Amino acid sequence: MYLTYDERYWVVDVEGNSLEPDRIWVTVVRNVQTDEVIRLYNREDWAEFHKDYYIYVTHNGLCYDVPKALNPLWMAGINYNNVIDTMVLSQLYYPRIEDGHSLAAWGERFGLEKISFHDFSKLTDEMVTYCERDTEITAKVFRALINRLKQRGYSERSCEIEHKFRHIIAEQERNGWLFDKKAAIKLYRDLRQQEYDLGLEIKKKFPPWPKKVNEYKYRLKQDGTPYAYYQQHVDKYQIKWTSETTYETWEEVEFNIGSPAQRVDRLLDLGWKPTKFTKKTPKGGGGNPQVDEESLLEFAEESGIPEVSMIADWLVLNGRANMINTWLENLGDDSCIHGSVFTCGANSRRCTHSSPNTANIPSVKAKFGEECRSLWIARPDRFIVGIDAKSLEALLFAHFLGGQQQHIDYMMGDTHIMNKNAIEEQLGLESTKAQCKTAFYAYIFGAYPAKIGQTFGLDSNMGEKI
């Protein structure tokens, strides 16, 4: 069904009065095989067209055209099993494709420019033309994508699974998750107060340090007095003479826990070894150490240095408060959070989440994790049921290693500690569990030796050995 077409396949595109429509102005259907175009303006037109068995091809139709427009407003009776969504096929084909998966982007790729149209307050000839062009682009995208997916070896089953999953997730997005706003505001305020108080304590642990601002020439006016800027420097900075005619301005810098650069500098002084770095830019920038919560907490535990533990605790408080603030910003009028999910958003074909990132909620065992999770509540007379699968990627990896029982046993253990021990025994390298975890997932998702080596602060040659 998904990787073929015949005369039963029709592209469908709907134009309503908003993204949350209460009226459909026009629906255009286009036959994928014959290119026949039909315009439908009301429920009766649709009922006459829909009386035969058809398969409907849409672009984002599992999220908009069918659930928000046709089925609720025209009682279209479309079975989701008969819907093909080219947005899903596009993401499955190439999740991180340049310029994205929009119909406009695909139109550009095929030389079919999407018409610019913005007035959806009333039905116009321009709107109908706009809708027809969208069906033209969608039909071409569909025909191209099924050929490309077949060339890459995708099966009907894989397309079916992704469509069913997208349908379920779209329903999840529409329903949202009930959120305890009152408790969230209280927790947010408590965390911000703790963050502020701890920040003051940290500041006491790190005294100010001198920092050079600039170097200047000492110049005199004709009357023998110095220029005004010199007195301004004297009033504002410490002056260090480097010769009879030049001086440097210096100032004392107070530690600002909110500055990532200052945090990195102080932690490096305390012996912290970074495991993550910013991406390098084409112009040679980037590659700077990043402070991540997991590796810092591990270092705090290993080192026993109080200042490290304090910075780690401050980062947790800051991160949790920022996260709750984001949740509150995305809270709807229905007291629910309707987070967005791209079901094939990552190159690995895993989901990505936004507005807000609901996949990044701290676990119950993490600091303030239970308090954060308790904000997501069930509707009256409903219950929250939690389920998780352990080591899915590791089990898949074991399967491709051969699937023997010893591989499965190995992967079901603490994989990252085992890898840490193996690296130390076989290569003589000290490492952390966090580094080994990062390297393991990077490896199974296709990272090259340079990336593996970078995880441990090493070069690509060592990455190859690891």
Language-model segments: which ranges?
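Conserved "right-hand" nucleotidyltransferase catalytic core of DNA-directed polymerases
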Residues: 1-15, 20, 26, 126, ...
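Hydrophobic "anchor" residues on beta-strands that sit immediately upstream
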Residues: 9-11, 55-56, 81, 384
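Active-site-proximal helix-loop-helix substrate-binding element of RNase H-like nuclease domains
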Residues: 20-25, 29-41, 54-151, 159-169, ...
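Metal-dependent catalytic core segments for phosphate chemistry
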Residues: 22-26, 386, 393-426
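Short amphipathic alpha-helix with an adjacent loop that forms part of the alpha/beta core around
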Residues: 44-51
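Cytochrome P450 catalytic domain signature, combining two hallmark sequence patches
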Residues: 76-80, 196, 272-279, 401-413
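Short, basic (Lys/Arg/His-rich) helix/loop patches that form interaction surfaces
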Residues: 425-433
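Short, amphipathic alpha-helical "recognition" segments used to contact nucleic acids or chromatin
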Residues: 434-445
